[in-house]
Amino acid sequence: MGTFNPFTLEGKTILVTGASSGIGRGIAIACSKMGASVIVNGRNEQRLSETMSEMEGDDNLSLAADLSDNVALAEMVAKLPKLDGIVHCAGIGQRVLCKQLQESDLENMMNVNFKAPVMLQTEILKQKKINKSASIVFIASIACDSPTIGNAMYSASKGAIISYANCLALELAPRQIRVNCILPAMIWTELIFKGGITEEELKEDEKKYPLKRYGKPEDIANLSIYLLSDAAAWMTGSNIKITGGGS
């Protein structure tokens, strides 16, 4: 008797952006363990190599490119095979009070967190690099509707990508291509240390969560596996919060 596994990714080719660290790295590694052929993208070739060294399988591929550069983006897409799954995970964070916002800060945040994934997805569709019945996952954030001081730019960028993804889900539904968003709360990655908060303060804050901890990249990876697998064949246009019980 065969083993029933509705979450297998065997036979699927999946692109993961932002795979050089954090959540993206965790997702890439997990997808490879579930049998997928994984293409990892990030700006730092050395860190992508570190991700590749932790992945399983011998048919994975690393494509370093700055997705905020339209030329580099188009060249990378041209190298892609047909995809069965895409995880848009590349992103940055920066805490700045509203009265101290600089236009350059806003442009950088929106370019990386919103424009780059939108234009990447556009180019993938234009070059017909995605298969029917594929799955697209955007890593957003509960910050979109959970305001905190100094987080206006980041919150707005994640709210924008969720709105885009919800529209994309409707447009691609006739081709059975599914589009969903994951909205994590605090996850232990390098990103959370860039807000000027100490590790001690973060460890004290995580005690406020009902499950008494922040999330780990693996927690987000496991949900991503579900959305990428055929087990989620009837799920599209959803925005899934994963928060350890926090609001």
Spans of model-derived segments:
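Substrate-binding pocket helix/loop in short-chain dehydrogenase/reductase
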Residues: L97-C98, D105-M110, E201, D205
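Active-site helix of classical SDR
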Residues: Q121, S157, A165
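Residue(s) in the substrate-gating loop at a strand-loop-helix junction
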Residues: S141
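C-terminal substrate-recognition "lid" of short-chain dehydrogenase/reductases
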Residues: R213-I242
